[in-house]
Amino acid sequence: MTYLGSIEALLFVAGEDGLSLRQMAELLSLTPSALIQQLEKLAKRYEEDDDSSLLLLETAQTYKLVTKDSYMTLLRDYAKAPINQSLSRASLEVLSIIAYKQPITRIEIDDIRGVNSSGAITRLIAFGLIKEAGKKEVLGRPNLYETTNYFLDYMGINQLDDLIDASSIELVDEEVSLFSMDSINTEDKENNEN
């Protein structure tokens, strides 16, 4: 593993939230000055590589990967693709969480899902199904997300109250848990005892 590769991997996973200089320095066990040198190398590599669509963006000592302006038309065309063919299971999962828990931060979504949701959020914003809804008044002031009017149109509903009751969804989860390995193992033990 190289420092440049490690930085790139961290920034890719961090998504639109990016990472602070301090966070990366701690993760990579580098001094801030050594990390800045590596970040400058990575930024230069992206700027000079015509075959790369990426740039390294720094704002208030927070770094993230973004696409070059020359790829904007392509990305707009991609975002206009038919949604029913383009939404992944992860995107649908994130969209459901936002619909029922809005406004909600990416970190809160990640906690519910157990995995990073940056890519799905970016895609849902590009499709116009969700939007940023301000900042949460906590340390770091993370973005809040909520659904859009287009989401309501796409779902064929007039208001969020028209969504299926969330408690019925939880019931399905409870039913699914009946088939977990724990309940099967318990049944086997009971049968063996009889």
UniProtKB/Swiss-Prot annotation:
Protein origin, superkingdom: Bacteria
Family: Belongs to the ScpB family.
NCBIfam families for this protein: SMC-Scp complex subunit ScpB
Alphabetic keyword roster: Cell cycle, Cell division, Chromosome partition, Cytoplasm
Transmembrane segments annotated in the record for this chain: none
Chaperone is among the record's keywords: no
Pfam families hit by this protein: SMC_ScpB
Organism listed in the record: Streptococcus agalactiae serotype V (strain ATCC BAA-611 / 2603 V/R)
Principal place of residence: cytoplasm
Any single GO CC term annotated in Swiss-Prot or TrEMBL for this entry: cytoplasm
Quaternary context: Homodimer. Homodimerization may be required to stabilize the binding of ScpA to the Smc head domains. Component of a cohesin-like complex composed of ScpA, ScpB and the Smc homodimer, in which ScpA and ScpB bind to the head domain of Smc. The presence of the three proteins is required for the association of the complex with DNA.
Location relative to the cell: Cytoplasm
Gene Ontology biological-process entries: cell division; chromosome separation; DNA replication
Gene3D superfamilies, alphabetized: Winged helix-like DNA-binding domain superfamily/Winged helix DNA-binding domain
Summary of the function given for this chain in its UniProt record: Participates in chromosomal partition during cell division. May act via the formation of a condensin-like complex containing Smc and ScpA that pull DNA away from mid-cell into both cell halves.
Protein name: Segregation and condensation protein B
Gene name tied to this protein: scpB
